[in-house]
Amino acid sequence: MSETFNSSEFLKTVTSSPGVYRMYDVDNIVIYVGKAKDLKKRLSSYFRKNLTNVKTQALVARIANIDVTITHSETDALILENDYIKQYMPKYNVLLRDDKSYPYILLSNHKHPRLSYHRGPKRAKGQYFGPYPNGGAVRESLHLLQKIFPIRQCDDLYYKARSRPCLQYQIGRCSAPCVDNVSLKDYQEQVALASLFLKGKDQQVTKALVAKMEQAAVELNYEQAARYRDQITALRRVAEQQEVSHSSGDMDVIGAHFASGVACFHLLFIREGKIFGSRSYYPKVPVDTELSEVLRAFMFQFYLNSDSQRVTPKEILVSDAFEEQAELAGAINTAQQRKVEIKSQVRGERAQFLRLALTNATNAVNTRLAHRNTVEQRFLLLEEAIEVSHKIQRMECFDISHTMGESTVSSCVVFNREGPNKADYRRYNIEGITPGDDYAAMKQAISRRFDKVAKAGKTPDILFIDGGIGQLRIAQKVVDEKFVALDHAPTLIGVAKGEGRKPGLETLIYGENEESFTLPADSGALHLIQQIRDESHRFAITGHRNKRQKTRNTSTLESIEGVGPKRRKALLQHLGGLQEVKSASVTELVKVPGISLEMAQTIHDALRG
């Protein structure tokens, strides 16, 4: 506890009301957020002389100030606590890191509705189906829908620009409503069936299609009957692949496992009796935290996330009971205006779902621990190989990528003792250098990374440079200049490619004295270096390709007189990309907003000339 914080004087000012408290350290950073039914009683418990919990002892030792917010009820305190945890991300709270909004399938409100992937605020008009557990589940569902229902998935600009059916029509994935190839009635029938399918009404869809097939056969329209038959076959094939429960309805099933500091919550999303999808969460857990606290924190943060657009089902099954289970159900009721039951003691089919979720959570934790142990072992071998006197906590690696000097990008990837730390990855677009000058590119990237070294975030213990002695010298010079007034500077090591660029033949070079050395091809230390080098290369080349494509799209149209930024953007958006602009006819170009007949002819001639 800070010398300036007097706990006894502070406690005299605290009431016994419900509320939320925020604990600050000497740097005025929030280190813990908590809630209490009785603030005075709860806060007093932190300052007892016989504290046994190691985590609580460490927390109390850092307290310099405490702010208190009184609420009307304990439920209000629960919701405010969750909001504060999300806002401040305190060090001593369990933090749910994966907080992306859930994706949906959107069926647009259009004359010819479109099926599309949607994530974010629901601003567009139409029907939303979901939420889905992840983006992969949405893309898989859209791919499946295309095979069964010939509904367009192109954007509206592309739809408006068509004068002939696209490839999706040729392969039977779209009925080409853009060129009136299907009647409005038939298209709307398919939209209605797709909507029922997305709501889980598979049997109703099948019955409707069987009736249509029989009617078409009676009318001797055998071609149409065959199309309905193919749809029915595809639907039944999908139904056979899905595990269906006719008694379970909608529910979330959560398996929780916690071991050696790694926690996993595996969620099964059961909708209309089917396993709709699954997702694993790995919250950040402070040292010496117990499973009960981890479980409580996860449940509250997951289900009281005000930014999430997911609708909580009426039933939640969880593998372990936790404190304030009833309070969470009440808070969900208050926040979402729906009654929810949370259960951990279930039988029959529900118990089978729980066992499945728990098995997945346990396997996920074991896999992570095995990976962490492998990475940890490689770190130890690296420390031994390069003879450092301290533990390596953070490593960074830089790489440069370009094509003949075009669209130069530098990457900086970060590894810690658990593996890649992707949240800290950075890319630098290199500007103002002679094209192809890798030395200048490296100098600019390293300079920007450590431009304000005191505010540069975590300083790496080891800085790898993917390149030879020349790039290493440049990087070492920049680091020496940036860290001249500081005690601790990173150790630089160059990773020069071996003969024929074969893995295992790399030469490693110390930046400080330029001594070179090699490691055995089967060395775990070398494998770790290769891993961070390859990851840096992947991250750099991905960024370079994206930048190059964007530049080429723009520069090709920039050369055409009269085509400014607005017209370039309209052309690319309306027609779907540069290749589509190049292949478009004058008639198609005229349909783009802001493009006259004369301008369309100019663009057509310039791109075909």
UniProtKB/Swiss-Prot annotation:
GO terms for cellular component: cytoplasm; excinuclease repair complex. Pfam families: GIY-YIG, HHH_5, UVR, UvrC_RNaseH, UvrC_RNaseH_dom. Gene3D superfamilies: 5' to 3' exonuclease, C-terminal subdomain, GIY-YIG endonuclease, UVR domain, UvrC, RNAse H endonuclease domain. Residues 16-94 form the GIY-YIG domain. GO terms for biological process: nucleotide-excision repair; SOS response. Residues 203-238 form the UVR domain. One of its GO terms (molecular function) is excinuclease ABC activity. It is found in: Cytoplasm. Keywords: Cytoplasm, DNA damage, DNA excision, DNA repair, Excision nuclease, SOS response. SUPFAM superfamilies: C-terminal UvrC-binding domain of UvrB, GIY-YIG endonuclease, RuvA domain 2-like. Interacts with UvrB in an incision complex. Belongs to the UvrC family. HAMAP family: UvrC (MF_00203). The UvrABC repair system catalyzes the recognition and processing of DNA lesions. UvrC both incises the 5' and 3' sides of the lesion. The N-terminal half is responsible for the 3' incision and the C-terminal half is responsible for the 5' incision. This is UvrABC system protein C. It comes from Shewanella piezotolerans (strain WP3 / JCM 13877). The lineage of its organism: Bacteria, Pseudomonadati, Pseudomonadota, Gammaproteobacteria, Alteromonadales.
